[in-house]
Amino acid sequence: MFYSQFILAKKGPLGTIWIAAHLERKLRKNQVADTDIGVSVDSILFPEAPIALRLSSHLLLGVVRIYSRKVNYLFDDCSEALLKVKQAFRSAAVDLPPEESTAPYHSITLPETFDLDDFELPDNEIFQGNYVDHHVSTKEQITLQDTMDGVVYSTSQFGLDERFGDGDTSQAALDLDEAVFQDKDVIGSDDEGVPGIDHNAYLDAAAPGIKDSMEGVSEAMPMDFNEEQVEDLAMNNEFIEDAQAPQTPGLVEVPNSSSVREQMACDDHMDVEDLNAEEGIKSSGELNANEMPKRGEDLSSEYNAPESAVTPVEVDKSQIDENVNTQNEPEEERAEHVHVTSPCCSHITTEMEDPGQVMNEAGANVVPDKPDAVPPLETPGEENRDHFAIATEVNQETDSSLQGDEQAYSRPDGQLNNAHETDEQLGNLTGFTDSDFPPPEKVLAVPNRQGDGNDFMVESTPDKEDPGTCNDDAGNNNITGKKRTFTESTLTAESLNSVESVGLIQSKRTADSVPDDDDLLSSILVGKSSFLKMRPTPVLEPATTKRLRSAPRSTATKRKVLMDDPMVLHGDIIRQQLTNTEDIRRVRKKAPCTVPEIVMLQRQALEDGLFKEPIFTGMSVELVSLHTEPYDLRGIMIIENDDRHASVGAVEDNECSVTAVEENKTEESSDPQAHPNDCEEQPGTAHTHPQEEQTINQQEELKDDNELAEKSDLEVLKEGNGAADEVNLVVIDDVSQIPSEEKLDRVEDLQVEESHENHDGEGGQDVCADPNEKSCTDVIEIAEGDTDINPIFNEMDLKVEDELPHEDEKTDASAEVSELGRDDQTPCDNTVGSTETGCLEAGDLSNMALENCNEPLVEANSDGLNPETESYNKYEPHNEMSNEEASMQNALDGEHTSRDGLMGDNDEMDTMENAHDTGFLNVDDDEVDEDHEEDDIQYDDETRLLENSGWSSRTRAVAKYLQTLFDKETENGKNVLVADKLLAGKTRKEASRMFFETLVLKTRDYIQVEQGKPYESIIIKPRPKLTKSIF
C-alpha cells in the first residue's frame, strides 16, 4: 500500500476524511462544517499520489459519514427554526363563541388623544347632560331606555367605583348639590299626592356631605309600617345573610374589628325590605309630614355615626302592605315580626325597641332590596311583586344615574304601575352574596365560554318562584345595570382556584348589555362587560391512595406499542411517584437475623457436607477444632506382651518416642505413662530400647510406687520435703513427624544431654544413653545426632508448685506446655516403649520420694497436649522455683512454636512455615526498602553478587525465603519445593505476588521452575546462584 504521508496528515486535504472513517466521534462540528464534500471526493478520485484501493474505500466511507453529519446538523437547525416560528405565532387556546371571535374596532382601538393625565372630573355640566366624554362607551350601550320624559341622567362613569386616583379624587363625585336630589324627588313623585321618592338618595354611611342630602330622602320615606307589608321578608332570608354580622334577632351590637375594606364588603350586602311598604304608602297617602325632619335628622345622625356594628332592626309590620296585597288574602297567615339586618346603618339601639315608632325614628335604616323573583306568602292570586334595591358601598360614590332593568311584571289588579317607574330609575340588586367573585380584571382574563341561558349570576333558589313572570321576559331579565359590590372585587385564594380550575365563571354579552359602573377601565379600553355566572360546585371524587393509570384501561386485546410515539409523563405523576412508592412496593422475604436462622441457612448451603458437621450448635472454638482435625490411624500398631500390659511398639515411620507403662489394674490402654525406676540416687543413664526389647518387667519398675493411683497419662513423682529438688522432664517431641527412614538412621543414636542446676546450687550431671543400664538420672539429655536441621525434641521443664492452697485445686499446665504433635496430624497416643530414636527416663528420685504419697502429681495426656498438674500436699511451703520454672516453660513454648513447622514432612512444613514467614508479601515495596536499608550496609560488596543489586525489596525477601527453604530441604535430603504448598492458605494478593517474584527469579536464573503436565503441581528447584547469594 503506497500513498503520500501528506494526504493523511492532520492538515492535509483528506485528514478529516480519514478521521471520520475511523474515529467518527472525535470530529467536532466545526470540522464537519469546514469539510468540502466535492473537493474531498475529487481528491480521492484524482489523488496527487496513487492511493491503494483499501485506503480509497476508507476515505469514501469517511466522506459518507461527514455528509451524513452535515445532513443531521441541517435537519436539526431547520427543526429548531420551525419550532420557534410555530411558538412565536401560536395563539392561545381561547374558547370564544363565533360572534366574539373578532372584536369591534372601537373596542380594541384607543383614540389618539388618549392620555391618563387627561382624566379629570368634569364640572357641573355632567349633571346637566351637556358633557360628552369620548373615553367611554356610547350612551346607548350604558343607558336603559325609560318612559319618563325630561329625566336627564348623567352618563359619567367616574365616581367611587373607579379604582385609580387619589383619595381626594375618589371623593370628588360626592360633592353633589342637594337640588339634584330634590328635582328627582319631584320628577319621581306619584299621582297619589305623595312627594317624589328617590330611592337613589340612600347614600353610603362613609360618604361626606350625606347630612344635607338626607333631607330629601327623609321626606320620601314612609312613616308607618304594618306587619302585613313586610311579610315577604321572611321568605328571603338568604338575601339578608351577611358574612360579617350574623343574623341573630337578639344581637344588638356586633363589633366589627376587621379593616375598612372588610367593613365595605359587609356593608354592600343590602337589607331587604318589601317594596310593598312604599306602594302602600303611595296608595294610602298616609304620610306624616311633621315627622319627616325628625327622621331626616335621625338618619343623618345614624349615618354620621362610626361604622362599628351591624344592628338588627325589628320592624312592626302591622301597617305595611294593606293596599298592595289582594283583598281576599288572609292577614292571619302573614308573619308578625321580621328581624332585618341593616349593615349600612350602624348604631340603632334604643329607637328600635318601640315597634310603633320604628319608621318614625329610624325609617331610613330600613333599606329595601329587590330580588329577582320573590313569591308572595301563601297567596295564589298574587303572581309577583316588584321590589327595589339600593346598592351602596362604603368607599364608593352615589351615582345619580343608576341604571336598572325594565322589569315588566304583570299584576292583575294594576296596583304596581308606579313601581315600574321606580325600577326604571334604580339598579336592581340581586339578593345573593357575591363575595366569591373575582375582580373584573381577573374575570376579563378568563376565556369566555358559552353561557347557559340567561342565568349569568349565581343561581338563586327562591322559595316559590313564579315561572310566568321570570320566563316571559327572559331576554330582558339580564341584570345589566347592577352595580358590582366591593365584595365582588375581593378575591380569595379559594375562590380563585375554584374559578380558574373548575371554570365556574361564565361570561355572556348581548346586544343590549351595558358595562358595569365599577368596570370603568374595561369599558373604556375594551368596551365589553364581564357578567358572571357560577355553577354549582361539582362533587369531588374521593381521593384514592393508588396511583392513577396514565392511560385508560382498554378492554380490547393487547396490541404492540409503537415505540416511536413520544412517552410523556406529567410532572404531577412523577412527583407522586417520588413522594409515594407504596403502590409499587413489593413484599420482601424475611432475612435471617437470629443465630439459629443463620446456622440453618448455612447448613442448607452445605448440602452433603451437612453430615460431616456436628449436630450441636454453640460449641467453643477448641471443640470445633478438635472435631475438624483429621486423624490418620494407619501407622498405629499395638503389640500385646502379656495379659496385664500392652506395650505399643514403634510404628513403621517411628513417629513417637514416649515410653508409657500401664498398671495392672487398668485395662488395655494406649496412653503413655512415664514412671520412676527403682534405682539409687546416683546418676544413671538414659536408655534407648530397640523394638525387640520393649518387654519390661512391670513388677521391677513399679515396686516402690504401688500406692500411687492409676494414671493413664504421663506421671512423674517428685520429692517434696522442702528441698528445691526438681524433676526436669524432657519429653521427646514428635519423633513421629520424621518422614522417612533415612532420618531414622541419622537419629538412631541420639543422646540426651541436659545441664541443670538445682535451687540448692547442685550442678546437674551429664549422662549418656546406654541400653545396658537402667539407672535413673536427674537430668535427661537428648542429643540431636549429626544433623542441625529441625530440632526433633522439645524440651519441657514441667514443674509443680510444692504448695497449693486447696487439695482440689488444679493448675492447668496447658498454658505452659506447648501442644505436642499438633503439627503432625497423626497423634502420638497408643505408642509406648522405647523407639529407635531415643528414650525417656525420669531421674533424681530418692527413696523418700518414692514413699511420699503427698507429692504433687504431674499428669500429661497421652497425646501430649494438655498436661494437668494436681497437688496433694496442702502443707508444704511454696517452692521458690515455681515462678522460674513457669517462665522457663513459656520460653520453651516459644521455641517449640518456632520449630514445629519444620518437624514434619515437607507438605506440613511448607504450610506452617509459610503461615509465619511470608508476611513480607503484604508489605509494600517502600516499607520493605526502609527495613532493608540497614541490612544492606552490613554486607560487603564482595560477599554479594552484583546482579541482585537492583532488585526490589520484595524480590530479595522472596529469594531469601526460598533460599532458607532450600537449605532446610537439603538437610532433609530433598532439593525440591512444590508451589502449591508454598501458596496454600495464602490470599489472592499474596499468591499473585509470590508467583510474580518467582518468575523474576526464574528470569534471573536463580531458580528452575518445572511443570510436567498442564494443571499439575509446579516444582521449584534451586540454581547455584541462589545458594551462593546473600540477600
Curated annotation (Swiss-Prot):
Involved in sister chromatid and centromere cohesion during mitosis. One of its GO terms (cellular component) is cohesin complex. It comes from the Eukaryota. The lineage of its organism: Eukaryota, Viridiplantae, Streptophyta, Embryophyta, Tracheophyta. Belongs to the rad21 family. Disruption phenotype: Decreased sister chromatid alignment along arms in tetraploid cells (4C) nuclei and impaired sister centromere cohesion, associated with a high frequency of anaphases with bridges. Slightly slower development leading to delayed flowering. InterPro entries: Rad21/Rec8-like (IPR039781), Rad21/Rec8_C_eu (IPR006909), Rad21_Rec8_N (IPR006910), ScpA-like_C (IPR023093), WH_DNA-bd_sf (IPR036390). Expressed in tissues containing dividing cells such as seedlings, flower buds, flowers and inflorescence meristem tissue. It is found in: Nucleus; Chromosome, Centromere. Gene3D superfamilies: Structural maintenance of chromosome 1. Chain E. PANTHER family: FI11703P (PTHR12585:SF69), SCC1 / RAD21 FAMILY MEMBER (PTHR12585). A motif (Nuclear localization signal) lies at residues 545-552. Residues 742-762, 803-825 have a biased composition (Basic and acidic residues). Component of the cohesin complex. Residues 461-481, 661-703, 742-772, 803-835 are annotated as: Disordered. This is Sister chromatid cohesion 1 protein 4. GO terms for biological process: cell division; centromeric sister chromatid cohesion; chromosome segregation; double-strand break repair; sister chromatid cohesion. Keywords: Cell cycle, Cell division, Centromere, Chromosome, Chromosome partition, Mitosis, Nucleus.
